Amino acid sequence: MDVVTRFAPSPTGNLHIGGLRTAIFNFLYARRHGGKFLLRIEDTDLARSNTAYLESILQALKWLSLSYDELVYQSVNVNRHREVALELLNRGKAYHDNGAVRLKVNHDETVKFSDLILGEISADGDSINDVVILRSDGSPTYMLAVVVDDHDMGITHIIRGSDHITNTFAQKLIYEGMGWSLPDFAHIPLIHNTHGAKLSKRDGAVDVIDYRTAGILPEAMFNYLLRLGWSHGDKEIFSIQEAIDLFDITAVGKSPARFDREKLYSLNSYYISGLPLERIASEVRSLVEEKIIVSYSAFIAFVELFRKKCSSIVELKDNLQFCWCTDSCLEVDRLLLQEVLKLLENTDWGPSLQQILKEYISLSGFSAKEVYTNLRMALIGQEHSPSVVEIMQIFGKDVVLKKLRNSLK
């Protein structure tokens, strides 16, 4: 059997991290088994559907390199949905109710299905409603449309959140009512906050776009969501290809995973420090509208120097503002900087710059903290930074002297 999975978001809001994890699991399962991963936009709610939300979904998948094999819009299949509703009526599996059509449920029978993650799940028939499948205005409901589309698209494995379990019982009856083969189901436990409650906007950002805007790298987001409920031994870092090779849906945990922003940012820091320097520089540059006022080689060197202390691209960008901004409102010790300027003007510092500054500190009466802090403020407009000596060496003597003179004007 050729595996076919699908991710079926609705363009009625921005894609949230739970939805993105579902997309990742569907993508990996299909690729792991040499199958197809389809994207279905469930846009039948015309009043709430929005092209901006649709674009955010498409961009999020592109951002994480989750390539899909086919894009389907549910709204184009409305006539097919109605056709199936009428067929269920003809088969005695549905009935009219005040102009609408409802699924006929045998409330005396137990409905059960086997889940690839949670095992066998069952529900008493009297707990399953005779759900509306066709509204009185002739429009199909989600409950019907999703089954028809999954069948017609040849979906073999439905991987989705555990909040859909109650839907599955009624949907199973639609499959059986039409005489269709049932796909395999895998319901992923929901994502909770660190306190064990359902994740919500009160816990901070939950939309994918918010994390992208905050400077999370796609590699970090992919890797973090991948391991949010799934693991492979003690391995913590996965490339997409490694994840494809190792992913097993039956290894997904049965309990809700807890979303920890600190762990996500820690993982992001790992990628900021470890990905190719040119890539990180490009990520920073994409956030800056202003012209870089240092040389490109200096900019690259500053990215390398500062990236080790940053947990997001936005934080790194903020630390590098001196590369495109000349304004600084920090007060400096003019006497100290005048002395340092005079010293540096008359010294061939080269590789001995560290020693030159140490000797000055020992003779000047100023502390090392005072000297280095004032140099930082004059050179980059910050009180704290990596090695000020390295910063000076990257700028070069001419630029350092110019900046010191400007700070004394």
UniProtKB/Swiss-Prot annotation:
Monomer. Its EC number is 6.1.1.17. Transmembrane segments: none annotated. InterPro entries: aa-tRNA-synth_I_cd-bd, aa-tRNA-synth_I_codon-bd_sub2, aa-tRNA-synth_I_CS, aa_tRNA-synth_I_cd-bd_sf, Glu-tRNA-ligase_bac/mito, Glu/Gln-tRNA-synth, Glu/Gln-tRNA-synth_Ib_cat-dom, GluQ/Sye. Belongs to the class-I aminoacyl-tRNA synthetase family. Glutamate--tRNA ligase type 1 subfamily. HAMAP family: Glu_tRNA_synth_type1. This is Glutamate--tRNA ligase 2. A motif ('KMSKS' region) lies at residues 198-202. It is found in: Cytoplasm. It comes from the Bacteria. Its main location: cytoplasm. A motif ('HIGH' region) lies at residues 9-19. Signal peptide: none annotated. SUPFAM superfamilies: An anticodon-binding domain of class I aminoacyl-tRNA synthetases, Nucleotidylyl transferase. GO terms for molecular function: ATP binding; glutamate-tRNA ligase activity; tRNA binding; zinc ion binding. Keywords: Aminoacyl-tRNA synthetase, ATP-binding, Cytoplasm, Ligase, Nucleotide-binding, Protein biosynthesis. It catalyses: tRNA(Glu) + L-glutamate + ATP = L-glutamyl-tRNA(Glu) + AMP + diphosphate. One of its GO terms (biological process) is glutamyl-tRNA aminoacylation. It is an enzyme of class 6 (ligase). The gene is gltX2.
